[in-house]
Amino acid sequence: MPLCETHLGSDQRMRGMIRALIFLLTCSSLRAESVILAKEGRALLPIVLSDDRLKPVANELATMLRRITGAEFAIQSSVEPHGIFLGVEFPDRGINAREDYTIRSGKGQVTLVGQTPHAVEHAVWDLLYRIGFRQFFPGRTWEVVPHSPSLIIEVDVSESPDYHARKIWAGFGHLKEREAVYGEWNRRNRATSGITLNSGHSYGAVMSRHEATFAAHPEFLALVEGKRQKPKFCIANAGLRNLVADDALAQFAKDPTLDSISYDPSDGGGWCECAECRKIGSATDRALLLANDVAEAVTAAYPGRLIGMYAYNEHSPPPSIAAHPNVVISVATGFIRGGYTMEQLLAGWQAKAKTLGIREYYSVNTWDRDLPGAARGGNLEYLRTTIPHFHQSGARFMSAESSDNFGPNGLGYYLATRMMWDVKEAKNIDSLTNDFLDKAFGAARAPMAKFYSLLDGTKRQALSDDLLGRMYRLLDEARGLGADEATQARLDDLALYTRYVELYHDYASAQGKERQAAFEQLFRFIWLIRQSGMVHVKALWRDLPNRDRSVALPELARYSDPDATNPWKSDEAFTAEQISAFIRDGMTNRKLLDFEPIAFGSKLVPATELKLPEVPRGNAGIYLRGVRDFWTWIEKQPATITLTGKAGIIYPTCGHAKVDLYPLAEAESKAVAHFEIPPDKADHVIELKTAFPGLHRIEVSDGTQGTLISWPDGMPMTLVSSQEQPAKLFGRWHLYFYVPKGTKIIGGFSEGGGFLLDPVGKTVHTFLDKPGYFSIPVPHGEDGKLWSFKHSAGNRFLMTVPPCLARDASELLLPEEVVAKDARR
């Protein structure tokens, strides 16, 4: 039905009535009443809008209600609230309240009123969510539209988002075929922003806008090795700071609708080396000084406008100066310098800045290649923990770089939208996940719950034939449970995703001509499934060939080449029989493991009661990178743990490596000792004092610069190496592990070459460079002894024996229950 064209924006009588209605909605304590929207396929209420700007969302509401009930809902414009009423006359609560809305049913009407048209749009999709509509992933396949010819609603809510900006965006961008459905998914899940916070690298843009000024004033540029040059400023120069402040004022004058401007440094190094800049302090202090000056000038002329800046790379460490109240610092969860953990970084910035944002990395195709559980966006525990924690730490803006890969990460992205709006939803993850499984898969929810557990990065599964075999078998089981047409379409999408994982596994494991052939098969396949959004086709096509020089695209097959002439691009679609064949062949070709993983306790104790023999001492590799835990034991307290540390082995510019000591007996799980290792490639004595006995965790965090930790021979010192807690060993290493009595199979996963030695030092298995599971029988009488990995590269994840590695028996810690049980035998 066409909309009424009467213009209502200037009708003062209507505005007064709506304001009175809002007063009643926000102040009344009366209980909401049930309202009937439709009965037996007949609409009982019209949709009424108070503002012409609400026409698009009114049309969407009418369309969706028709799909749900079968009824045609008339759309009217009126000065008097009635029916399903949409209004924007909300009390003005400022920039932070642009998305606030209220929904209330009662007196035969349903009222949706918001601060802005944007807020009313949120209210409409919230109402539809409460009715049962879901848009789990982008596109019609992943819509869930309930069938309710008779529709009743009872609701009384006032909503405001916990994060003012909620962006889940795709690095590398979207295919044109995916842009509209992705935007639709964001809107339908309230994953849009009331405030636009700009925080990207900006120094280069300033230089471009004022090219003549910089040419006339080279002293505005950074002094590097005696030469004034881009891409950084000489921030100590007051004239430069005035220029940048004027630049900001000019931008706001040009576009008064701007909420913010970014003055984040250009990427990489090149910071000024002049004496005056050195006096200011760190790269962070310099960048923040400039942002503060800009904010001071902008606030005077344009109150309430924001200046955005990242805490990223060389300017990620916390500053020594406070941020201006209108400077919003978005802390990046990757590319952290200075050896800080994310927790330390947040605490440091929270102490200096009024408002924080988070620059997240839910999925970066270069890192995770759309594989199961490989990205943060597919790690439900990470999302459940971090989104409310960041908010508690002062974050009010969330920008999450992601990928258009709803195969591995779709459930995580969907749950993230719920938590970004309301962090309390983190407590409801299980019920939200069950809602997803019930509505998306119906009778097939049981096998699909198991399928999604394989995708969950909380307990990531190694990429292997076993994983593929289990995925295919669960899909086959789900398809056999009488799925309806809508559910079958979703299962088909996930079958195509599983086929992608299979093809990628074959490609990644191949060499020579076989690798090129597997690469071609992979790329031809991903183009055929591009509209499903299961994998990020644009990112793979643009990035993978540039990273892997052992393969090549043929002539005219680059991403930028026209689709019509690209020999690897086809518009064909897979048939139902072809998809069924993928599943059948996958079950046949991908064999399952012959062992069950065993869970061991986390309370470790010395293995001395087992009276294990002396063995040649091994080694733990050449260095560590990132964060690694060492486990040690204090027999008698107080004690001093003495180690030797060398940092900056690979990158000497990442700041000090940090060493923290955590006794497990400390009630609040706090560190009791801290040491920082300068990145000078020199040996430094580390002394960590503790007043606690028993098990201690030594955490070393070095920002991936490369750090070597050494300890005296015979000191209890063990590494845990499981899929949940990888040891992250570098170089060739030789470490021992214990095979408990009664063990029949040593099972696990290997990521590189090396040898497995039995208790007498005999090689019983040779590991290949290709990642994969291993299953080694334990001969009679060889259990209850030390085995070892020798000349090993990459990680070994132990799954049927305790995942505890040490240089010899004297340094080995084992799960308490294993020692107690085997010592009695």
PLM-predicted stretches and their roles:
Residues 281-297, 325-342, 419-427:
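Acidic, His- and aromatic-enriched active-site or binding-groove loops in soluble protein domains
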Residues 413, 420-651:
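Catalytic domains of carbohydrate-active enzymes that cleave complex glycans
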